[in-house]
């Protein structure tokens, strides 16, 4: 998820990479007569990076938005149908416990990568236990650096999350990769946008209630 940008920052060619991507997108998205529209995905909003200089008509939809919220993952019904189609309906409870729990917009969804991998293994061995398919698919160096910098309060909040409690935080959706670990408060925005935490509602003053989504992440 963050692997490419972690390498850019670590090896100190971040500005050069931003310039390269800006030129690439300019050619591919603006001066391409054969392109009707483009759909781009990522963890963090990229508007502040200026990689879209010269382009317009963008619509940014984050995991906080309700539009297309069910398209960010599998719904309960979709997972039930998938399991049933392979004769694995009895494995729904553990699938839900391990891979459900994400709240995108107004929808509750599962991580597709995990569900697909678990069903694939169950199809050959119905005694297989759920496991962590997710962590090895991403780079976590930025998260580790932020946690290493954590003060006593932040570590206490992490412990509260691990035991199943919620914490309330203001999140920023305007971070850029090169400023992520400049402030320990950015930790919560990074954990949220990269899937380690999910939304459990809002407080009256607009803060987000955050929780660990499922057993896999714990």
Regions found by a protein language model. Give the residues of each.
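Short, small-residue-biased leader/transition segments that mark boundaries at the very start
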Residues: 2-9
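Phosphate/oxyanion-binding active-site loops and adjacent basic polyanion-contact surfaces
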Residues: 13-21, 75, 184-187
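Substrate-engagement module of ASCE P-loop NTPases
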Residues: 14-36
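Generic, well-ordered alpha-helical scaffold segments in large soluble proteins
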Residues: 23-27, 31, 82-86, 98, ...
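A short beta-strand-to-loop transition that corresponds to the Sensor-1 phosphate-sensing loop
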Residues: 32-48, 54-56
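A structural signal for short, well-ordered beta-strand segments and their strand-loop junctions
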Residues: 37-42, 109, 198-199
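Amphipathic alpha-helical segments of the small helical/lid subdomains adjacent to P-loop NTPase cores
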Residues: 48-53, 61-120, 157, 162
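Extended alpha-helical interface modules used as scaffolds for assembling large macromolecular complexes
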Residues: 58-59, 110-218
């Amino acid at each position: 998820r963050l692997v490419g940008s972690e390498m850019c920052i670590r090896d100190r060619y971040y500005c050069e990479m931003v310039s390269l991507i800006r030129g690439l997108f300019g050619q591919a998205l603006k001066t391409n007569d054969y392109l009707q529209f483009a759909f781009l995905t990522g963890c963090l909003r990229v508007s502040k990076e200026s990689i879209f200089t010269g382009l317009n008509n963008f619509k940014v939809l984050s995991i906080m938005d309700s539009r297309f919220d069910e398209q960010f993952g599998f719904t309960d019904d979709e997972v039930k149908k998938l399991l049933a189609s392979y004769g694995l309906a009895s494995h729904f409870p553990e699938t839900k416990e391990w891979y459900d729990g994400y709240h995108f917009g107004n929808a509750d969804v599962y991580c597709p990568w995990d569900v697909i991998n678990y069903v694939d293994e169950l199809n050959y061995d119905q005694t297989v236990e759920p496991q962590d398919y997710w962590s090895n698919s991403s780079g976590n160096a930025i998260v580790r650096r932020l946690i290493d910098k954590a003060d006593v309060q932040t570590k206490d909040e992490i412990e509260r999350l691990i035991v199943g409690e919620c914490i309330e935080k203001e999140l920023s959706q305007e971070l850029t990769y090169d400023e992520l670990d400049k402030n320990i408060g950015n930790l919560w925005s990074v954990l949220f946008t990269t899937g380690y935490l999910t939304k459990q509602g809002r407080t009256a003053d607009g803060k987000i209630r955050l929780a660990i989504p499922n057993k896999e992440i714990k």
